[in-house]
Amino acid sequence: MLLYVTDYLARFDSGFHVFQYLTLRAILGVLTALVISFVVGPPMIRRLKFVGQPVRSNGPTTHLCKAGTPTMGGALILVAIAAATLLWADLSNRYIWVVLVVTLLFGGVGFVDDYKKLLAKDSRGLTSRYKYFWQSVIALGVALFLYFTASVAAETELIVPFFKDVAVNLGGYYVLLTYFVVVGSSNAVNLTDGLDGLAVLPTVLVGGALGIFAYAAGHSGFAQYLGIPYIPEAGELVVFCGALVGAGLGFLWFNAYPAQVFMGDIGALALGAALGILAVLVRQELVLFIMGGVFVVETVSVMLQVASYKLTGRRIFRMAPLHHHFEIKGWPEPRVIVRFWIITVILVLIGLATLKIR
């Protein structure tokens, strides 16, 4: 929005041309989202105290003391991301609208889930059937839109990391891949969001890394040099990634152990979907699988636990997702959180290394 204002003012003062630079607008997106989080956060948390989070009766006993902690704090993240993006991004860029709409719609699904938990005082929330139905509708809708509006072949190709010039033409399978990446990423982050700050910092790290991929993919010179596909509209996603980083760090200020507020599904489902659609837009789905390894392992632990119990009557882990397994083994919550953060830092660095190792 402000890009149009600065474009007009540049007619009278050339100094306003500085706002054309993506890097500056990305930094301003980070700072804007951060300031919004710090300003809006405290009063929002005070209001949310009237709607405390019910705690699962079958969860770790150490979590019982968290009953009543305000939830739905993800609304703060969405407000900060949306405001910062709308202020500093080029709103004529279709990718900006795609990532914003997907993030907010998945946040809407999460809001309904959280609302049902709070209204009925039931920690289970929205039934899985309805949750997956609406997630599927949104994901398939955006996948079809992107498939039919693709302007270059690279937009629907699967890029294989670590190998130079290896791209698989997906054709119609692009829609299926996009669906699984967006829905899978959304639910993976949601499963990981079980400890204070556990999900939000990895989301920030992965989102920031995807911003680097977006900047490189949107610049023809960098894309050619690094051997990644050039996607003309991808560069503007750096502003959204900046807003995500700022909003995530701002929320972490209140969500760090011991948490003053929980993200809730409104935040976790939205952030996971944002990472998924970002990876799709910059054609780095496989790299997302690497960088988001913590999310992947958490999800796989649940799948293995359910499958093992149904097939053999035995559980592989003491409790799933995996972070609860370590809690029950006696690890203090902060230790689990920080070690998962460290693993994410390592995985993100490996993901970024794919830019050069080909």
Swiss-Prot record:
Top-tier EC class: transferase
PROSITE patterns: MRAY_1, MRAY_2
Pathway in which the depicted protein is active: Cell wall biogenesis; peptidoglycan biosynthesis
Cofactor requirement: Mg(2+)
One GO CC annotation: plasma membrane
GO molecular function, one term: UDP-N-acetylmuramoyl-L-alanyl-D-glutamyl-meso-2,6-diaminopimelyl-D-alanyl-D-alanine:undecaprenyl-phosphate transferase activity
Protein name per Swiss-Prot or TrEMBL: Phospho-N-acetylmuramoyl-pentapeptide-transferase
Entry's transmembrane regions: 21-41, 71-91, 95-115, 133-153, 166-186, 197-217, 234-254, 261-281, 286-306, 337-357
One Gene Ontology biological process: cell wall organization
Gene: mraY
EC annotation from Swiss-Prot or TrEMBL: 2.7.8.13
Family: Belongs to the glycosyltransferase 4 family. MraY subfamily.
Annotated membrane topology: Multi-pass membrane protein
Catalytic activity: UDP-N-acetyl-alpha-D-muramoyl-L-alanyl-gamma-D-glutamyl-meso-2,6-diaminopimeloyl-D-alanyl-D-alanine + di-trans,octa-cis-undecaprenyl phosphate = di-trans,octa-cis-undecaprenyl diphospho-N-acetyl-alpha-D-muramoyl-L-alanyl-D-glutamyl-meso-2,6-diaminopimeloyl-D-alanyl-D-alanine + UMP
Keywords attached to this entry: Cell cycle, Cell division, Cell inner membrane, Cell membrane, Cell shape, Cell wall biogenesis/degradation, Magnesium, Membrane, Metal-binding, Peptidoglycan synthesis, Transferase, Transmembrane, Transmembrane helix
